[in-house]
């Protein structure tokens, strides 16, 4: 190291000491598991997360309420499987998610990370059933093996 390099390094020390250091938890915002279809798109999650979409014609639909209760009871099962949940209870808004999946009434849709539809269900599913359908996917099998 020549004299110039040493001086340059010494000059940087005060700046480095003065800059705030963020921990990993402070640097990252907490992940929001459940998102509204008006605030996101399927393309946003391609190859990043698996997507579970819950459609209904109204947030008051008893099937929608039941599905959301089941999801909210065991969020760790979805977080462990790299899932984001998208809800759409406003068919008049014609969200991009609703148009892409052509939903009518209540529908539960699970998509793989590549965006392909894994399941479509006209009734609520419990977390065990959703988890099993995700765990059968080839990419999920690979993730389990690599742990």
Feature roles, as predicted:
Residues 2-147:
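Non-catalytic interaction/Regulatory regions outside core domains
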């Amino acid at each position: 190291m020549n004299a110039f390099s040493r001086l340059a390094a010494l000059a940087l020390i005060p700046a480095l000491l003065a800059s705030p250091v963020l921990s990993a938890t402070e640097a990252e915002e907490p992940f929001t598991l459940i998102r509204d279809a008006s605030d996101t798109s399927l393309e946003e999650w391609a190859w990043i997360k698996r997507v579970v979409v819950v459609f209904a014609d109204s947030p008051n639909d008893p099937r929608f309420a039941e599905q959301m209760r089941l999801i909210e009871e065991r969020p760790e099962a979805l977080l462990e499987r790299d899932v984001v949940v998208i809800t759409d209870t406003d068919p008049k808004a014609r969200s991009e998610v609703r148009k892409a999946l052509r939903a009518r009434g209540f529908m539960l849709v699970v998509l793989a990370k590549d965006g392909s539809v894994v399941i479509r269900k006209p009734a609520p599913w419990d977390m065990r059933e959703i988890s099993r359908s995700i765990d059968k996917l080839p990419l999920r099998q690979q993730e389990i093996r690599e742990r």
